[in-house]
């Protein structure tokens, strides 16, 4: 069976996250409802991962089984149709038709998240939806020093919130970069997979280092505890974005130059 694979971006401000919720509006629900308007029934849509409430996406990937309907025969017509039906805060960036061996979640070999901090107590109007003001002087050199202890393969249990069933809490971080733009600071986190609220908890630990709560090397102690209660508080959700999802050949339709597929496969 052919899979319709979509690359999408969304502003998560008005949504309770990706996954359908009983009493709140979700990204998944809006997309599935749009599909139902055309085919007359619900078509389940599966994403690469469940983003939380208010979390954004620049490069989320999702898939659904191709319906037996004339408007779903070509990728270009699917993209045009969905964008006409979806609200302005959800945009289909690209569509491809893949085989049934592809799975947006289980075929992924890496993801990149970005978290944006602002130094301005009064950010520009639109920035308040995408950046967090931590109310202290950001010491990016200390944050980068602390980030180095998280690189590589570790048990990230101390950085994983409860609420998910994990077969393992071991993950690999390929990159954790603190990019200082002056007015804003972007934390770029790239790894082979992420636990529930893992990125926000990592950002929380780096902010604690920045404000002087503990030295950079204390990150090692947090890792060794393997206990969420010993970890830092999570940073707010609204400044986090899922930026890229990487897939191996032949499923690297949406991969950017940042996705070095061969090296990621070797590291995984």
Swiss-Prot record:
The EC number(s) given in the record are 5.4.99.12
Residues annotated to bind substrate:
113
Quaternary state and interactors:
Homodimer.
What SUPFAM superfamilies does this protein's entry cite? Pseudouridine synthase
UniProt entry tagged with the keyword Isomerase: yes
A GO MF annotation of the entry reads: RNA binding
What name goes with this protein?
tRNA pseudouridine synthase A
EC class (word): isomerase
Instruction: Quote the catalytic residue positions.
Output: 52 (nucleophile)
PANTHER family, sorted: PSEUDOURIDYLATE SYNTHASE (PTHR11142), TRNA PSEUDOURIDINE SYNTHASE-LIKE 1 (PTHR11142:SF0)
Q: What does this protein do?
A: Formation of pseudouridine at positions 38, 39 and 40 in the anticodon stem and loop of transfer RNAs.
Cysteine-cysteine disulfides: none
Q: Which UniProt keywords apply?
A: Isomerase, tRNA processing
Q: Name one GO biological process term.
A: tRNA pseudouridine synthesis
User: Gene3D superfamilies per the record?
Assistant: Pseudouridine synthase I, catalytic domain, C-terminal subdomain, Pseudouridine synthase I, catalytic domain, N-terminal subdomain
């Amino acid at each position: 069976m052919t899979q319709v694979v979509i690359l999408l971006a969304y502003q998560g401000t008005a949504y309770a996250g990706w996954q359908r919720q009983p009493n709140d509006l979700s990204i998944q629900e809006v997309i599935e409802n749009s599909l139902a308007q055309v085919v007359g029934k619900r078509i389940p849509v599966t994403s690469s991962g469940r983003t939380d409430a208010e979390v954004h996406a620049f490069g989320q990937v999702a898939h659904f089984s191709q319906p037996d309907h004339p408007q779903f025969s070509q990728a270009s017509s699917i993209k045009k149709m969905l964008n006409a039906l979806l609200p302005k805060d959800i945009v289909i960036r690209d569509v491809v038709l893949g085989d049934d061996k592809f799975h947006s979640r289980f075929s992924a070999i890496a993801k990149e998240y970005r978290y944006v901090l602002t130094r301005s107590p009064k950010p520009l109007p639109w920035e308040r939806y995408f950046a967090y003001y931590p109310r202290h002087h950001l010491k990016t050199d200390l944050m980068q020093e602390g980030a180095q202890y998280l690189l590589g393969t570790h048990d990230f249990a101390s950085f994983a919130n409860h609420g998910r069933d994990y077969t393992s809490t071991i993950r690999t971080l390929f990159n954790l970069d603190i990019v200082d733009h002056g007015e804003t600071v972007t934390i770029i986190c790239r790894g082979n997979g992420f636990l529930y609220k893992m990125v926000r908890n990592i950002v929380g630990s780096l902010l604690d280092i920045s404000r002087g709560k503990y030295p950079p090397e204390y990150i090692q102690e947090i890792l060794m505890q393997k206990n969420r209660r010993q970890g830092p508080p999570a940073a707010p959700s609204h400044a986090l974005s899922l930026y890229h999802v990487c897939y191996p050949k032949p499923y690297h339709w949406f991969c950017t130059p940042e996705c070095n597929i061969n090296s990621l496969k070797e590291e995984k």
